[in-house]
Swiss-Prot record:
Gene: rpmJ
PANTHER family registered for this protein in UniProt: 50S RIBOSOMAL PROTEIN L36 2 (PTHR47781), LARGE RIBOSOMAL SUBUNIT PROTEIN BL36B (PTHR47781:SF1)
Domain of life, per lineage: Bacteria
InterPro entries referenced in this protein's UniProt entry, alphabetically: Ribosomal_bL36, Ribosomal_bL36_sp, Ribosomal_L36_bact
Family named by the database record: Belongs to the bacterial ribosomal protein bL36 family.
Organism expressing this protein natively: Flavobacterium psychrophilum (strain ATCC 49511 / DSM 21280 / CIP 103535 / JIP02/86)
Listed HAMAP family: Ribosomal_bL36
Keywords per UniProt: Ribonucleoprotein, Ribosomal protein
Leader sequence segment: none
GO biological process, one term: translation
Molecular-function GO terms, alphabetical: structural constituent of ribosome
A cellular-component GO term for this protein: ribonucleoprotein complex
Protein name in UniProt: Large ribosomal subunit protein bL36
Length: 38
């Protein structure tokens, strides 16, 4: 999980999800792309 100031979709499989007021990027196919907005 990377914490970034700005989160972007790094592949077409990435999904942007809002949980508890934070933005997350999740990717089932390639979990390396997981991110959270700091």
């Amino acid at each position: 999980m990377k914490v970034r100031a700005s989160v972007k979709k790094r592949s077409p499989e990435c999904k942007i999800v809002r949980r508890k007021g934070r933005l997350y990027v999740i990717n089932k196919k390639n979990p390396r792309f997981k991110q959270r907005q700091g």
